[in-house]
Design a protein with these regions (language model features):
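C-terminal interaction segments
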Residues: 10, 14, 21, 145-212
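Internal, glycine-rich beta/alpha segment that forms the wall or movable "lid"
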Residues: 55-63
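Short helix-capping/linker segments at secondary-structure and domain boundaries
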Residues: 88-94, 119, 162-170
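Short, helix-capping/interhelical loops that line the mouth of catalytic, cofactor-
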Residues: 1-52, 56, 100
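Glycine/small-residue-rich hydrophobic helix-like segments
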Residues: 118-161
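Amphipathic alpha-helix face/heptad-repeat signature
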Residues: 35-42, 71-75, 103, 146
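Charged/polar, low-hydrophobicity segments characteristic of intrinsically disordered regions
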Residues: 18-33, 110-125, 186-204
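Short, contiguous alpha-helical
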Residues: 1-15, 62-117, 157
Length: 212
């Protein structure tokens, strides 16, 4: 089934369609509530399948194959990141939870990818990352004596590496040239290099704007 979908999507992409447009044929004109119900039902099935999967099992995807564990983390990241767009559009402040640690870890793990994907030389040393979790715990990656560091809220770090916020719209403290460069190009997802949103362009719309 996946091989068929992959073949169709690849063919549409070769014809110049966007990834979004390439999905229309197999969605069979589903939209609105019907599309949501299809997505929700399939997400439950996917959750059950992942719960019983061997974490090391290799899974095919539109990009390179990945382990089930990596695929689970990637799906969580994508759902969280695109979900932020919904919170922003509806003017709802999101409540963060410590499950966001998986996304922060993926952000750190893709440090090298953020540079390689743009044809840039990967720095020898990864910055020290010290984040405050939603529950108040301290999460750390890297060596605390590193000349470069990133410190701040875990939720804001996740927003930057998933490119739902410009780093200048957060209170993350980036020290050192490597850390500052990384936060300008951070990309924890696969695909061609994507630029983060422009400063001030992504935010949660104030509720009063809805006139209700």
């Amino acid at each position: 089934e996946f091989a068929k979908i992959y073949s169709n999507v690849s063919s549409h992409l070769d014809q110049g369609m966007s990834l979004l447009e390439s999905q229309y044929p197999f969605l069979n004109e589903l939209s609105g509530k019907n599309l949501f119900e299809r997505w929700y039902g399939n997400s439950r099935k996917l959750g059950v399948a992942f719960a019983h999967a061997d974490p090391s099992m290799r899974l095919k995807w539109f990009g390179p194959e990945m382990s089930a564990k990596s695929s689970i983390t990637a799906r969580q990241m994508e759902t969280w990141a695109h979900g932020q767009e919904i919170f922003d559009a509806l003017g709802v402040k999101r409540t963060a939870h410590d499950r966001i640690k998986n996304i922060c870890h993926l952000g750190v793990a893709t440090f090298g990818w953020s540079f390689t994907n743009r044809g840039l030389k990967v720095p020898h040393h990864i910055p020290y990352v010290r984040l405050i979790s939603p529950s108040g715990q301290i999460w750390e990656w890297g060596d605390s004596v590193s000349p470069s560091s990133i410190k701040g809220k875990a939720s804001e770090f996740a927003e930057v590496v998933t490119q739902v916020r410009n780093v200048q719209d957060t209170r993350l403290a980036s020290e050192g040239a490597i850390a500052k460069k990384w936060m300008k190009i951070a990309q924890c997802f696969a695909g061609k290099p994507e630029n983060p949103p422009a400063k001030g362009s992504r935010f949660t719309v104030p509720r009063e704007n809805f006139g209700v």
